Every structure is written in structure tokens, then in C-alpha cells.
Amino acid sequence: MSSPSPSSEAAAAHHHHHQRRQHAGAAGGSGLVPLAALIKEEARAERPMGSGSRICARDEEDGGGGGGAEGGRRWRRPLLRYGCAAQSKKGEDFFLLRTDCARPSTSSSSSSSLASSPPHTFAVFAVLDGHNGNAAAIYTRDNLLNHVLSAMPRGLSREEWLHALPRALVAGFVKTDKEFQHKGQTSGTTATFVIIDGWTITVASVGDSRCILDAQGGAVSLLTVDHRLEENVEERERVTASGGEVGRLSVVGGAEIGPLRCWPGGLCLSRSIGDIDVGEFIVPVPYVKQVKLSNAGGRLIIASDGIWDALSSEAAAKCCRGLPAELAAKQVVKEALRTRGLKDDTTCIVVDMIPPDQTIRHPSPPKKINKLKSLIFRKKTKDHPNKLTKQLSAAGMVEELFEEGSAMLSERLGNDSSGRRTSSSLFTCAICQVDLEPSEGISVHAGSIFSSSSSKPWEGPFLCSDCRDKKDAMEGKRPSGVKVL
């Protein structure tokens, strides 16, 4: 799949160089601006997509060739309005704003229909919070999207494309980490990567740069999981089982101070991109969640821990309700600085998904009696079903399509009996996309023949020997000090 050209970016730069565009309707000051007036003005403007801080709503043909409620029908895309604000302390926060990324049409589409139909597009928003330098954050910002798209099969309908996206995100994150580590630089980064296609939101994340959804009616829900060792018991157990040590910093006299860290390295996070000087049990495999909003719309807040160390999810959502996206992002940063001061890089992106054919208010404070006030998505288990997700879904606000947070590549890449053959009948590595002879590919399930899983080690997806070595290291199957470079 061809990747979007850099020249089509709406914005993709460090916050020191980011110049935000402001519409005439919001230029009068920093006070509250009626959303109805903004939408009416933008509807008259009819600017092309990617100009300014919005996406024009329009019909789009699914072209799916059947399957799904939207297959073969035209549907209305939401209007996207976004804003970004940041304050720098260390110069290690970066972000990505792209509103005109293209996915190819299905192979069954005729050339005449392609000429008359609008392009199949999606938007990408990302926050990258670097540590130990900014090299990993910059590299991830510049390469992660291309790596995700290279892992997507060609000729998919929109429904199939969305279904394949979680797996491609896993492959893209791991490839980005692997290629950055080849550079030998020691920095690392969190990554929260949000893809919006129509009303469907797919979020992949490592680290603690959180993404929340503020739905109409005041329901605030998490679309990410924090990979901080201090709060995440499952991640602590995984790291120790893989050969890492978890503890606090020891000072003279034997006292322990600060948050829980992973040793060697002293990192507070259990998942990141980069960090070559830390054990391989610090993995780049992302937590992925995919949801579909109702046409009531909603607001996304994506931010680095400079925000979340100062504000709870509910406080961040509440402090900017009633404001348009650009002012909302500034308000969240302002509130975080007021609460805690500038102790870390602080970055916030706000994205509003607005129905295209009706006047909708920005998310407003909930009523005094509202059972959906603090709905939080939690990881589903057999013993504890996700009742909160069911409540939110029953309210017609959001439909959960996918959720997975396992760090095991064999679980995340699934089964593929075809092995993704290329046109030359070679196999393709599911991570780095290099061509493999049939005798060279190693199944991601190899070594699990006696497990209770239904996976078969002679089936794909397949990995090259380099990616297989990395998989084994991440799962504690070889000494973490032995790096694959």
C-alpha cells in the first residue's frame, strides 16, 4: 500500500514549530464560541479536506463487495475538528496530525468508479512522549504510519481494512522499534496512535500517553491502558516472568524512593518504542482498542503524561466542555499547568467528531443524575465481563469492536494459513515485510505445538529469523542482554 506523501500532512512537527490555524469565527478571543456558528461558517467555506483544522463531511461508498451494515451503501462521514496545544520542559514531546491519509480502493472497483468517487481517506492523530532524548519520538513520528500501512494486505474493502487494522498496528509498532534499535541510540518513547475512519476509532498505545473518549451526555471512557509499573499489576508480573526485576530506586542507607522501575535500566514503563539499553522485556507490542461511535458524536483527548499527572480523565474532559477543539486543547494544558506547574513536557490533542448534517453542541456537563458519568472501559475477562462497555453500548453511544492487550506476538498476529504470499510466491515476514523463501519462514506459533491453543506451528503468519529472535527475547526465551541488531 502506498503511504501518504509528507507534503499532504495537515501538521506533523515538534510543538515549538507548530503554527495553529484559527478560523475567523474563533478569532475574536479565547472565550466560548457557539458551535452552531462555527459549523455554519465552515459549511459555507467548503474548503478542501486537510485545509485548516477540519475535514469536510461527505458521502463515501464503502465499496466492500458485501458484508457489514454499510456494505455497498453510501454513508455520512463525521466532521472532524481538532486542536493541539503544548508547553515544553525537556523538548521530548512530539505529535502527529494527518487528516488526509489514503487507503486504496478495493481491487473490484472499476476505473470509471474510481474516477468519479471521492478518495477513501482516514485521519491519524498521535502523541509521542520521548525519554532519554528525543530521537525515538522523532523516528516514530516519521515512520510508524508507513510501517503500519505496509503491513496491511491490498485490495480490502473498508470493513476488511478496519478488521485487519489491529494486527497491522502490532506489526507496525514492532517494526518501528526494531528498526530504531538498529540505529544504536538509547532513547525511547511512548506512542499513542489514533486512526479515525468514518465513525470508527482505532487506538494503539504503549506507555502512558492516554487517550480518552468524552461522549455526548458526559460519559468519559479510556481507550488506552497505562503501562506504568506502579499501577499495572499484570505488566509487573509479565516483566518479572520474562527475567526483569521490578523495584524502587535504592539510596544510601537502603531506603527505597520513587516509583516502581524495571531493572536493568530503571524505566518506569513496561512498554515503549526504543530503549535499547533496557531489557527486551520492555516490549513495543501495543494495547489496541477499536470502537465505533454513534452519530451523536464525541470528543477525543490525547495527551502526554504531563497532562495526566496533573488531571484525572474526568477532570480533563470536564474543564474543556463547551469549547471548540482548538480552545479546548489550550484549556486542558492551562488547567494542568495551573494544577501542577510545568514539571514535564505537556502536550494535548483534542479531536471532535461531529455529525455532518445537524447542529451539535460540544460535549456538555452531565446531568446531576447520570449513571453513565464515569464509564471506564476495562479489559474483558471470563470471570468479570465488561458490564460498563455493555452499558455504554446499550445507551447507543459506542460499539466496542476490538480490544486486546497481550504482549505475546503469537496471540496478536493470529493465524494466517496463506502466509501472505507475494506475487512471486514468496512468503512475507509479518513484521518487517521482507520476502522469504518457503524454507526460510518461521511460524510465529513455532514452539507452541503442545499448547492448548488451536494455533498450528506449520501455519502462518511467518517471521524472518531476525524478527523471531526479537519475539523470543520479548517473551523471555533467551537472555535479555543479548540484543538483536
From Swiss-Prot:
Its EC number is 3.1.3.16. Residues 1-11 have a biased composition (Low complexity). The keyword Magnesium applies. Binds 2 magnesium or manganese ions per subunit. Residues 13-23 have a biased composition (Basic residues). One of its GO terms (biological process) is regulation of intracellular signal transduction. Belongs to the PP2C family. It is an enzyme of class 3 (hydrolase). Residues 1-29, 43-72 are annotated as: Disordered. Residues 107-353 form the PPM-type phosphatase domain. Mn(2+) 2 binds at D129, D305, D344. Mn(2+) 1 binds at D129, G130. It comes from the Eukaryota. One of its GO terms (molecular function) is metal ion binding. Its cofactor is Mg(2+); Mn(2+). This is Probable protein phosphatase 2C 3. The keyword Hydrolase applies.
